[in-house]
């Protein structure tokens, strides 16, 4: 087979979990490590999280997302850990043969003794919400809007309604306000917020942004561009209550309605998945149903506290035996 390579450990994903796993493996005596990252730089989602609040547990100081990611990148480079950027893994076989492609190397086949899945998670799209209305411009996932503002330098809109009170949505409510947009409200389907209390206070209360619990978007107005949204209160069965509709004019709707693990590779490998989280089922050593294949970070399940996963052991004893 052309371009056949071999590595002791291959880590799919160069975000904080993948970097932490690589550093841990290197410090435990594994020298032959390869990180494969599909983006143009390491760091994962943290590169667009320019707010502070990271690093208190791991580094004992408050850092922004990029600063936090850079700490792990620096450790990986100091340990001479090999990594490929701008590389997409398109298939992994049950015998741990990885097929990847990038512009420099073309199609590559990599045989790994052990694999760590650290692909992270993705946002739940509008299609999963069954919101009536047309499909005008101006509807974004909160993470997409975060990247547009923080990395690309674009404002998604001037008048914004946010559906969902996850932490990304709360943080973007503050960010857009600081950039000059008017955030009309944050609507949350559940009778409680999905974000941290700290973020509710710092991102909504401090800027007088209303949080409407037990409310959801039932209609989107506009054909070419969002012109307004209609929200309604929901009952205990999460069904809209007739007569409670309210319409708000806006040009942008942000969706912050949950994150789901990137599980396409896991499904192709026939790894057993957790029906509640859609991430791989793992044992106490974070090993999946396939021997020698491990998973860590948000690919298991989304957690609002990054340090919960970074503090877990990512190089258990049976992984050391497998390599």
Regions found by a protein language model. Name each.
Residues 1-323:
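Residues forming the flavin
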């Amino acid at each position: 087979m052309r371009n056949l390579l071999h590595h002791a450990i291959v880590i799919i994903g160069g975000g904080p979990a993948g970097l932490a796993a690589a550093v841990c493996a290197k410090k435990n005596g594994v020298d032959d490590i390869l990180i494969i990252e599909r983006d143009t730089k390491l760091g994962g989602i943290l590169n667009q999280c320019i707010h502070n609040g990271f690093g208190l547990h791991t580094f004992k100081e408050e850092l922004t997302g990029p600063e936090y990611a850079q700490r792990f990148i620096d450790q990986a480079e100091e340990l001479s850990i090999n990594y490929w950027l701008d590389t997409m893994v398109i298939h992994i076989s049950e015998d741990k043969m990885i097929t990847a492609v990038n512009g420099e190397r073309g199609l590559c086949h990599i045989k790994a003794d052990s694999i760590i899945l650290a692909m992270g998670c993705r946002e739940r799209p509008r299609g999963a919400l069954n919101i009536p209305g047309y499909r005008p411009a101006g509807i974004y996932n909160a993470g997409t809007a975060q990247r547009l503002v923080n990395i690309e330098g674009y404002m998604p809109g001037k008048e914004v309604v946010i559906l969902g009170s996850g932490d990304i949505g709360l943080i973007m409510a503050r960010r857009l306000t600081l950039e000059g947009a008017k955030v009309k409200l944050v609507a949350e389907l559940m009778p409680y917020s999905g974000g941290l209390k700290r973020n509710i206070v710092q991102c909504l209360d401090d800027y007088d942004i209303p949080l409407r619990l037990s409310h959801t978007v039932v209609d989107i107005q506009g054909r070419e561009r969002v012109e307004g949204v209609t929200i309604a209160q929901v009952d205990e069965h999460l069904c809209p209550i007739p007569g409670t509709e309210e319409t708000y004019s806006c040009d942008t709707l942000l969706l912050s309605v949950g994150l789901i693990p990137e599980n396409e590779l896991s499904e192709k490998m026939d790894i057993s998945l957790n029906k509640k989280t859609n991430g791989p089922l793992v044992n106490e050593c974070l090993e999946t149903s396939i021997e020698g294949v491990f998973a860590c970070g948000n690919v298991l399940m989304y957690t609002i506290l990054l340090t919960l996963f970074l503090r877990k052991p990512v190089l258990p004893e049976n992984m050391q035996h497998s390599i």
